[in-house]
Amino acid sequence: GKICLSDDINALMNEANVGAEKMYQAGLQCIRRNSATGKYYFIENSSDRKIEDWIPLRTEARSAAIFNPMTGASGLAAMKRNDGQTDVYLELNPGETVIVSTSGQHFTGDAYAYYQNAGEPNPVSGSWTVSFVQGGPQLPASITVDSLGSWTDFVGDEYKSFSGTAVYTTTINKAPVADVIKLDLGSVAENASVYLNGDYIGTVIDSPYQLYIPAEKFKGQDELVVRVANSMANRIAYM
């Protein structure tokens, strides 16, 4: 071993053969740990733009796998070797995170699902019924609205002071035109669980509030339910 002294942190890192990860130049941040067969990367998109690109990892690998801790999606990453490093293709919205596992061994399994937009966004049109199912200080009356929005914008103090859970329900009459449909809920305060025709699709608790739904779950006339729970801020303000 040896002790190195310098005022230049980059020089010290180079001397110790600890190289910087180039992904930081793309607006990504990571925590890197060694594993028995390779490395683990916890990667966050800390920029304000979506990342859809090949991202270099400072490691040599034969295989790489991606796991999304928020959605549970996982699979083998698209990757390529490049001059002693490994490039992995990532799609990350601002604030989104994934875990990438690299290995000198050959992984087998399903490929990680990457998505490309098949066309322009198609808004969910029609009315929504909003029912308040749990919370207080009292349960407001159900209401029908023309578009999704915060219940604090509804007319009436009972809506503005309500903290709890409300269920937004609508009917979709358009058949999907792609293999997978991305449902973008926009801004949610604070979390939302989505059901299609009674089937649980998933829960979102942070931005981006998006879920991917296989086209085969749609029947042509579909009931979409969004169960939203907010924080206690409204009720505290009421008190």
Where are each of the predicted segments found?
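Flexible, active-site-adjacent loop/turn segments at secondary-structure boundaries
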Residues: 160, 186, 237
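Carbohydrate-binding surfaces of carbohydrate-active enzymes
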Residues: 1-165, 173-180, 199-204, 212-214, ...
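Edge beta-strands of jelly-roll/beta-sandwich modules across compartments, strongly enriched
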Residues: 232-239
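A short beta-strand element within beta-rich, extracytoplasmic domains
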Residues: 172, 176-192, 224-226
